[in-house]
Swiss-Prot record:
It comes from Chlamydia muridarum (strain MoPn / Nigg). This is DNA repair protein RadA. The keyword Zinc applies. Belongs to the RecA family. RadA subfamily. GO terms for molecular function: ATP binding; ATP hydrolysis activity; ATP-dependent DNA damage sensor activity; ATP-dependent peptidase activity; damaged DNA binding; serine-type endopeptidase activity; zinc ion binding. It comes from the Bacteria.
Amino acid sequence: MTTTKIKTQWACSECGSYSPKWLGQCPGCFQWNTLVEEIHSSKLKTSSYPLSSTTPVPLNTVKFQEEIRISTRSKGWNRLLGGGTVCGSLTLLGGEPGIGKSTLLLQISSQFAEQGYKVLYVCGEESVSQTSLRAQRLQISSSNIFLFPETNLEDIKQQISDLAPDILIIDSIQIIFSPSLSSAPGSVAQVRETTAELMHIAKQKQITTFIIGHVTKSGEIAGPRILEHLVDTVLYFEGNAHTNYRMIRSVKNRFGPTNELLILSMQTDGLHEVENPSGFFLQEKVVETTGSTIIPIVEGSETLLVEVQALVSSSPFSNPVRKTSGFDPNRFSLLLAVLEKRANVKLYTSDVFLSIAGGLKITQPSADLGAVLSVVSSLYNRYLPKNYTYTGEIGLGGEIRHVTHIEHRIKESIIMGFKGIVMPSGQIKGLPKEYLDQIDIIGVKTIKDAVRLLQ
């Protein structure tokens, strides 16, 4: 009589790498306390995927076929995905619990259903009545949306075969399990295998699939890193529970540009696209105040204006405080060091706080100039030129370096009615004459030149 040998392995919940024994730190991604136990059978496992019968073909003989895309009423959603949702694609939507992922996909499902597409919504985390109540609140009622409260992957595959949907939504991948695996739902093996199975179904049957995934405390999608490599598109749902706006950012897209940004407003009847993001973020700006600048930032094909606020106060302690919100703290420390060294602005006895108004997170270096001038304005309690925007990267030598998409930043400043823009002097030459006629452009070469703008 033969017995099946059981083998224990430890898998990292962050990157999916394996270790034969428990380790405090993952050898793959170097994260701490991420290894979880998994039990594997030595019994030979056969793949459930059919063997491929295709043969290699020369590259120059392949005929290009344009992807078939499904458009919705939301222009922002279509832009986010590169011109519409590609048929047969697999999209991963990640976000914190309660931020509105299910609400968003239910609204998108309604727009698909309006066009006659059949939608299978697998609501594994909620009952049919709970999902139906949400649909009523969103004023959604369609005979083309089918709710299926199931977590067993085999039952889901059977319903896909019977119903033949055009759109499949999995809410959420962390609760779906395959009975062929002994590990618990949400484990590394379950998330990896169920996603791979769904990807195969999406490609084989040309079913457009959306998967909801929860994020960890660090803001990354929970589960192995390979999850993001398997799917075609990765969208991050960002926002704050204390504000009524949400942002969706595309960090991966095989069928379109990345780093696209969609800003939504959460209201009682669901999520609504914000058509004027710059006006949305500047609507609460105080007209006359020190320590405040407006900077133009570019997110994908979208340009928007946001406010940078700084507060500098004397510190009673030997180690002054440096705090940021929405701005890279390491980058901020570097900018303060350059400010002291190259512009002789003394901050070693002051607490310095910097915030991006509205809760946005900015990583692009074009925000350097606005951040530094906000700090200096607050320190000296002096005003900067009124109705100007500021853009420029600051180097370690104190020089103001070029930024990308400068024409887009100038154009957005003109549209929003600003009087002028402060920018790197080296980029003024070559600008279209129409911009020079519509807005006052001030060029700065160094950080010292920028500080002299203070009244």
